[in-house]
Amino acid sequence: MTSQTDFLAKLVPGYQGIAQKWECDNMGHLNVSYFFGRSSDQAFFMRHALGLNPASLRDSGHGTVALEEHCRFHREVTSGGMMIGRSAVVELRARTMVVYQEFRDAQDALQATFRTVIGFFDTKARRLVPWPEATREKAAKLSIDLPPHAAPLRVPAGSAVAHVSRADSLAEGFFRTGGAGVNSWECDQFGHMNTMFYVRRQTEAGPHFWQLLGLDQPGLIASGRGFAVSEMRMNYVDELYEGDIVETLSILREVSDRGARVEHRLYNVGTGALS
């Protein structure tokens, strides 16, 4: 067996599907929000491997919640491209754990990697609680070291994000790039907006962001040029539910000869909370 075969054998298999044409962006490859959607699909299999089945979670009033996701995009996926998901535990903590996910094609070429911090959540008290002992035992058997190809590269892993008011963000230089409501079909089995739709708000804000900075994105695409996201980090600060109104504010943090670093902040219009 090769070292890669040995490594893959340690991971929990799960999602297996393809990229649909309607999931691809104006550059012709899978929109980044759908990578996060695949990550959510893979999470079902990881919860199952950890003994967290949907019925027992509902009956006990518990769930899991993503607190931070760091993603690196290693290869573009186009319409019809096959995707195979696998995952493992990287670090087990009292109320949270770090999970590794990866997606590869049918030839095992790496497409994307995720380093995700998840927590065990009391759905009634709306707070994190300790993992069940049975889950801790299963997690210990599914643990690996984070592979180098998933380590943060240009976007560092973060820490807990404190609330920043919309007014303070605007004063810092953020400007409005998007706005939308939360639909019922965007919410997961735990009742809050699925992570991929947090990312969707950002991908929809992107063209407005560059247009407001004076960059003609349609013209770029017509000339055979465009943008590709290589790495991103998501911090989930507050839950969003069906009917909430979300506003996206953005700022250009850094520009280099090969790329740029952009920060987006999502605000709940009704409560003013950073989401």
What are these regions (language model features)?
Residues 2-15, 72-84, 89-163, 236, ...:
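HotDog/MaoC-like acyl-thioester-processing domains
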